[in-house]
């Protein structure tokens, strides 16, 4: 949620309320989770608190709190500190999203997934310690440039496909891939963030509607059960938006957008190359089983010809 802003005309679907009080699982003696991915607690197991961080400039503002650039004072680790207000989350009934985000993201290790290190809380707030992505939101970059060229878009497609394949192998569906939830690292590499809508699959093949209207697949609009193939549809929409500058089914009316999605009313401007059209058309299929698999996305001729992905050095990214 770095550099988060409300985006029009997109509409975020309201999650179901009534999930009970906020239950962030904490060790009462430490206020910090243990396990993989954490910013290590001091050797004396001192409770983490806001006093352990130097707080810098705000990186973004969201409905439930803000994100700040911060540095852990002892370890000198630069991170993004996401500050969420408990009362606001309880009021909106989204505590389950926080628990889900912590549960899922803390176990994910991939160069194109934003790292979740740790969390702690006080009486009124929950603090999430996240990897800092210095180049911010992809959406801001898209606003700045209008659209991306084939090389940049193909690079993003390879990165997001590799990250999602990793998620799907771990039975995690993201369900909310969109430029606002994709951050950019030091080298401009894509980082999937905001796992609040994610679910473990296949045990939770839900019919609930979530995500952003322009990115919703037909099966979710039509109320059918869905699986990891919703993410295939989303990256097809993402590819189109990166190349064109707006989503493929966007209209001024929600009802008309729904209709265009369910009919897969896909129209390409002349600026979209044949290779990109082929890839997008193979992802934006009404039938989930007909959508191009992630491995085939990474091996698609247009992606192979245009992607400039650079893998990071193979070394531990754990702070010491």
UniProtKB/Swiss-Prot annotation:
InterPro entries: Aur-like (IPR030616), Kinase-like_dom_sf (IPR011009), Prot_kinase_dom (IPR000719), Protein_kinase_ATP_BS (IPR017441), Ser/Thr_kinase_AS (IPR008271)
EC number(s) on file: 2.7.11.1
Chain residues that bind ATP: 59-67, 82
Catalytic function, reaction form: L-seryl-[protein] + ATP = O-phospho-L-seryl-[protein] + ADP + H(+); L-threonyl-[protein] + ATP = O-phospho-L-threonyl-[protein] + ADP + H(+)
Active site: 176
GO terms, biological process: cellular response to UV; chromosome segregation; cleavage furrow formation; microtubule cytoskeleton organization; midbody abscission; mitotic cytokinesis; mitotic cytokinesis checkpoint signaling; mitotic sister chromatid biorientation
A UniProt-annotated Pfam family: Pkinase
SUPFAM superfamilies with a match to the protein in the record: Protein kinase-like (PK-like)
One Gene Ontology cellular component annotation held by this UniProt entry: chromosome passenger complex
UniProt main location, coarse: nucleus
Gene disruption: observed consequences: Embryos show severe brain necrosis.
Keyword Kinase: yes
Compartments reported by the entry: Nucleus; Chromosome; Chromosome, Centromere; Cytoplasm, Cytoskeleton, Spindle
Activity modulation comment: Kinase activity is stimulated by cell-cycle specific phosphorylation.
EC primary class: transferase
Domain of life: Eukaryota
Alphabetized GO MF terms: ATP binding; protein serine kinase activity; protein serine/threonine kinase activity
Oligomer status and interactors: Component of the chromosomal passenger complex (CPC).
Family: Belongs to the protein kinase superfamily. Ser/Thr protein kinase family. Aurora subfamily.
Purpose: Serine/threonine-protein kinase component of the chromosomal passenger complex (CPC), a complex that acts as a key regulator of mitosis. The CPC complex has essential functions at the centromere in ensuring correct chromosome alignment and segregation and is required for chromatin-induced microtubule stabilization and spindle assembly. Involved in the bipolar attachment of spindle microtubules to kinetochores and is a key regulator for the onset of cytokinesis during mitosis. Required for central/midzone spindle assembly and cleavage furrow formation.
Entry protein name: Aurora kinase B
Organism of provenance: Danio rerio
Lineage of source species: Eukaryota, Metazoa, Chordata, Craniata, Vertebrata
């Amino acid at each position: 949620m770095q550099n988060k802003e409300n985006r029009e005309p997109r509409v975020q679907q309201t999650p179901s309320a009534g999930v009970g009080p906020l239950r962030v699982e904490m060790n009462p003696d430490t206020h910090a989770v243990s396990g993989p991915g954490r910013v290590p607690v001091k050797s004396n197991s001192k409770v983490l608190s806001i006093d352990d961080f130097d707080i810098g400039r705000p990186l973004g503002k969201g409905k439930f709190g803000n994100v700040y650039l911060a540095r852990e004072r002892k370890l000198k680790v630069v991170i993004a500190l996401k500050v969420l207000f408990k009362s606001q989350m309880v009021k909106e009934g989204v505590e389950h999203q926080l628990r889900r985000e912590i549960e899922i993201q803390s176990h994910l290790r991939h160069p194109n997934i934003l790292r979740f290190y740790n969390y702690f809380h006080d009486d009124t707030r929950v603090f999430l310690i996240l990897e800092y992505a210095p180049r911010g939101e992809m959406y801001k970059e898209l606003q700045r440039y209008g659209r991306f060229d084939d090389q940049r878009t193909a690079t993003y497609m390879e990165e997001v496909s590799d990250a999602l394949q990793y998620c799907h192998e771990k039975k995690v569906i993201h369900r909310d891939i969109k430029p606002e939830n994709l951050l950019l690292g030091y080298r401009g590499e894509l980082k999937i963030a905001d796992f609040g809508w994610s679910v473990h699959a296949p045990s939770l093949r839900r019919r609930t509607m979530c995500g952003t209207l322009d990115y919703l697949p037909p099966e979710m609009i039509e109320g059918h059960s869905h699986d990891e193939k919703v993410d295939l549809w989303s990256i097809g929409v993402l590819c189109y938006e990166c190349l064109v500058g707006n989503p493929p089914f966007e209209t001024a009316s929600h009802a008309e957008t729904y209709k265009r999605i369910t009919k897969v009313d896909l129209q390409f401007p002349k600026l979209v190359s044949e290779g990109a059209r082929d890839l997008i058309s193979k992802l934006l299929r009404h039938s989930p089983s007909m959508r191009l698999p992630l491995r085939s996305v990474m091996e698609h001729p247009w992606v192979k010809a245009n992607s400039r992905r650079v893998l990071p050095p193979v070394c531990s990214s754990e702070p010491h």
